[in-house]
Amino acid sequence: MKEYVMLLLLAVCSAKPFFSPSHTALKNMMLKDMEDTDDDDNDDDDNSLFPTKEPVNPFFPFDLFPTCPFGCQCYSRVVHCSDLGLTSVPNNIPFDTRMVDLQNNKIKEIKENDFKGLTSLYALILNNNKLTKIHPKTFLTTKKLRRLYLSHNQLSEIPLNLPKSLAELRIHDNKVKKIQKDTFKGMNALHVLEMSANPLENNGIEPGAFEGVTVFHIRIAEAKLTSIPKGLPPTLLELHLDFNKISTVELEDLKRYRELQRLGLGNNRITDIENGTFANIPRVREIHLEHNKLKKIPSGLQELKYLQIIFLHYNSIAKVGVNDFCPTVPKMKKSLYSAISLFNNPMKYWEIQPATFRCVLGRMSVQLGNVGK
């Protein structure tokens, strides 16, 4: 249960907009989670996203002790310094701190020694500051850092020398234009990368930038991509590229991502998806193609036996064929659709044959008609 509480707290901290929980509620949640590890933990626990091993020594929340940065609240190895108008990282952060919350301040720069000695640091939250620079040696001693939140700042590049222990990096809404080749070198624990709302173009992703990295979730929405990047990790389970400038999806674009389960391409400029494209992602369960310029249902959907959700609303689709969604081979086993959205397309909905949706969970799973008309 403790690990889920930690996940909930960190998810709230990364949400947009952020509504800070009361200090009392935050303390109660963290007390349940932050008693899990200490400096004597072995490497297996250090490499766990949600450490569960109990400490060898009894736990004492260090708000029993006087050491705490001025104006902050310290409890259960958490240092909570958000919304204080800080212009720099405060001193006197206890060495055994597991989580530092510095969001919603006015910090412009992270210096080399700001987190020096925090060898147990697990999560660092720096969302919504004015960061333009992070020293390349800042994270050399934070070798247990698993979650780093840098969203809503003014960073022009992904920080160098990130800890190899990092599992989640969120750098949404910054000014990042390039992902350099060695940015994630050796970061085998990185599983989640969220970097939407950055002015990133396709040529800004250098060849080999993700080489050797096992990332499961990447979101590069609200950027300047004109096509699906080809050099992302083949381990991807989720790829979200919504709100870009992608106009076509070619056969080779998804060939590298055969394990993909969720694909987000909504709110682009897609007019054509090449035949056979979706055969390259046979495990996909959810596809978002809403708010594009498609004139027909993409081919190959009926062959995706795990596909359950397909969003095609707000396109230019004029016709739906009886076999566009469901298998034509009687013995083929396919998951039932739980959602097919086709509303706000210039089609004559009354002409769609009932058999078109023979592999749908129920009538409520299909959305037709023109909303607002």
From Swiss-Prot:
GO biological process: bone mineralization; negative regulation of tooth mineralization; negative regulation of transforming growth factor beta receptor signaling pathway; response to fluoride
Molecular function in Gene Ontology: calcium ion binding
Glycosylation sites: 48, 275
Domain notes: The repeats LRR 9, LRR 10 and LRR 11 are involved in binding type I collagen. The poly-Asp region is involved in binding calcium. The LRR 5 repeat can inhibit BMP2-induced cytodifferentiation and may be involved in the interaction with BMP2.
Disulfide feature: 68-74, 72-81, 326-359
Region entry Interaction with TGFB1, spans: 159-205
Effect of mutating residue 194 to G/K: Rescues the inhibitory effects of ASPN on BMP2-induced cytodifferentiation
Stretch forming the signal peptide: 1-15
Name of this chain's protein: Asporin
Residue ranges listed under propeptide: 16-32
CC per GO annotation: cell projection; collagen-containing extracellular matrix; extracellular matrix; extracellular region
Record's keyword terms, sorted: Biomineralization, Calcium, Disulfide bond, Extracellular matrix, Glycoprotein, Leucine-rich repeat, Repeat, Secreted, Signal
Induction of expression: By TGFB1. Induction requires ALK5 kinase activity and SMAD3.
Tissue spec. comment: Higher expression in heart, also detected in kidney, stomach, testes, and skin but only weakly in lung, skeletal muscle, small intestine, and thymus. Expressed specifically and predominantly in the periodontal ligament (PDL). During tooth development, strong expression is seen in the dental follicle, which is the progenitor tissue that forms cementum, alveolar bone, and the PDL. Expressed in the perichondria of the maxilla, mandible, vertebrae, and long bones. Predominantly expressed in the perichondrium/periosteum of long bones (at protein level).
Record InterPro entries: Leu-rich_rpt, Leu-rich_rpt_typical-subtyp, LRR_dom_sf, LRRNT, SLRP, SLRP_I_decor/aspor/byglycan
Annotated function: Binds calcium and plays a role in osteoblast-driven collagen biomineralization activity. Critical regulator of TGF-beta in articular cartilage and plays an essential role in cartilage homeostasis and osteoarthritis (OA) pathogenesis. Negatively regulates chondrogenesis in the articular cartilage by blocking the TGF-beta/receptor interaction on the cell surface and inhibiting the canonical TGF-beta/Smad signal. Negatively regulates periodontal ligament (PDL) differentiation and mineralization to ensure that the PDL is not ossified and to maintain homeostasis of the tooth-supporting system.
Subunit and interaction comment: Interacts with type I collagen. DCN can inhibit collagen binding. Interacts with TGFB1, TGFB2 and TGFB3. DCN, BGN, and FMOD inhibit binding to TGFB1. Interacts with BMP2. Interacts in vitro with type II collagen.
Superkingdom, natural source: Eukaryota
Residues covered by the LRRNT domain: 59-95
Extent of the LRR repeats: 96-117, 120-141, 144-166, 167-186, 189-212, 235-255, 259-280, 283-305, 306-327, 328-349, 350-373
Cellular localisation: Secreted, Extracellular space, Extracellular matrix
Family as reported in the entry's similarity comment: Belongs to the small leucine-rich proteoglycan (SLRP) family. SLRP class I subfamily.
